[in-house]
Regions:
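Glycine-rich FAD pyrophosphate-binding loop
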Residues: 25-51
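N-terminal Rossmann-like FAD-binding beta1-loop-alpha1 element of flavoenzymes
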Residues: 6-34
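Short FAD-binding loop at a beta-strand-to-alpha-helix junction that anchors the flavin cofactor
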Residues: 339-355, 365
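Internal hydrophobic alpha-helix adjacent to the cofactor/substrate pocket in enzyme cavities
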Residues: 363-383
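Dinucleotide-binding Rossmann-like beta1-alpha1 core, especially the glycine-rich loop
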Residues: 53-129
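Mid-domain catalytic core of redox enzymes
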Residues: 27, 221-338
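Active-site/ligand-binding neighborhood in enzyme catalytic cores
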Residues: 94-99, 104-235, 239, 246
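Short, solvent-exposed loop/turn segments at secondary-structure junctions
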Residues: 14-17, 39-41, 105, 161, ...
Length: 384
């Protein structure tokens, strides 16, 4: 690939693909063809006003943008303004409600005590020491080594097993990298400097991002139905499932998916917060979402509620969470080797790299990859 290359095909119009499309069109002046199999852009981050209530509903589950990286924040603010929403998460456990992540409020409510920060720290250290786990072999042992048994059994075990559809002792330890604990009464979920929801919704953000005249967006367009009509060695940004790109030749990668049951209720407020985790194993859904709370600057007389259910997806279902067992990672390593043999294709996004990425990471990795590709193009080297 060299500087004569003037066209790029982008497969998927989520954050990764949309950032790439915007950068190639706006900065390099290239023609960009975006192929999106759904009937809208935005991927799983898409949101749109509910026709019955006017409430902005996140079709594929809540997405709260949060970052401490100024570059990504400034980049997205070209296409949207954000409100001042600050995310909180609450959890229901045996009929009682607790704030997450773990902090003084949750610990003291659970124990029925009034521990100071120092006392809570000593209590947690004793909890962890009691387990005596130096080298965790699975998710359960990893969690016990971080927070101890009391918090784990109250808030993590049943919720995690419900979400993943597996026993915590069967899940790999690296699914949990950390379990944040704040020994304060701060119940804000994120620590990032910038947080919020686009004031006009994610749909408007993506539409503006892709509005450049050099960008052609084709909706309802499955790449795999069109691939034989595309240039064989033209530059491509691919954000679909990496295993499908290579026709599952090394096997399928493991995923979990979620589905949502929607209710429109003729009341002003259903649960008093945007997200409620359901920690009890006998409750079939994992979370309850109430979207009006994402826009506290607006008022509505009705409300929209989603109940979230986790399940093992079929081959045609949407993939949400990579399982990444040892077997999955062995398969993925083979696909990484395959990807190196197609240097004109840049794999990115959650599906393309088989990793869970939040929006901030997706935007920042797309911007970084674009700079890498741009530099390769200018130098006349292979770019992906």
């Amino acid at each position: 690939m060299d500087s004569r290359q003037k066209t790029v095909v982008v497969v998927g119009a989520g954050f990764y693909g949309s950032v790439m499309a915007e950068r190639f069109a706006n900065e390099l002046g290239w023609k960009v063809l975006v192929l999106e199999k759904r009937d809208h852009v935005g991927g799983n981050c898409w949101s749109a006003p509910d026709p019955d209530t006017g409430i902005e509903v996140h079709t594929y589950g809540p997405h709260i943008f949060h970052t401490s990286h100024e570059l990504g924040w400034k980049y997205l603010n070209q296409f949207a303004s954000f409100n001042n929403y600050r995310h909180t998460v609450w959890a229901t456990r045996k009929g009682k409600v607790y704030p997450l992540p773990f902090g003084l409020a949750a610990i003291n409510l659970l124990l029925g005590r009034r521990l100071s920060p120092a006392e809570a720290r000593a209590w947690m250290q004793a909890e962890v020491a009691r387990e005596g786990i130096a080298e965790p072999r699975n998710l359960e042992e990893k969690a016990l080594s971080l927070i101890g048994r009391t918090l784990y059994e109250a808030f993590v075990k049943e919720y995690t097993e419900k979400h993943w559809g597996m026993k915590a002792t069967e899940l790999p330890a690296y699914i949990i990298t950390r379990l944040p604990v704040r020994l304060t009464y701060d119940v804000g979920y994120y620590n990032d400097r910038w947080q919020g929801i686009p004031t006009e919704g994610y749909g408007a953000l993506f539409n503006k991002m892709l509005a450049h005249p050099n960008i052609e967006v084709r909706l309802n367009s499955d790449y795999f139905s069109l691939r034989n009509s595309l240039p064989a060695h033209g530059l491509m940004v691919y954000t679909g499932p990496i295993d499908r790109f290579f026709d599952y030749k090394h096997g399928r990668l493991g995923w979990r998916s979620v589905r949502f049951e929607k209710q429109v209720l003729d009341i002003e407020d259903y649960q008093g917060t945007s997200v409620m985790n359901e920690c009890d194993g006998d409750v079939p859904f994992t979370r309850t979402h109430e979207f009006k709370h994402f826009t506290p600057e607006r008022t509505f007389k009705k409300t929209v509620v989603f109940r979230e259910y986790s399940y093992l997806p079929g081959p045609d279902d949407d993939m949400y969470y990579p399982v990444r067992t040892t077997a999955d990672l062995a398969i993925h390593a083979k696909y990484i080797d395959e990807a190196r043999r197609v240097p004109h294709v840049a794999f990115g996004g959650r599906l393309g790299v088989y990793a869970y990425l939040d929006m901030e990471n997706t935007v920042s990795t797309a911007l970084d990859k674009y700079e890498e590709l741009k530099n390769s193009i200018v130098a006349g080297r292979t770019g992906a």
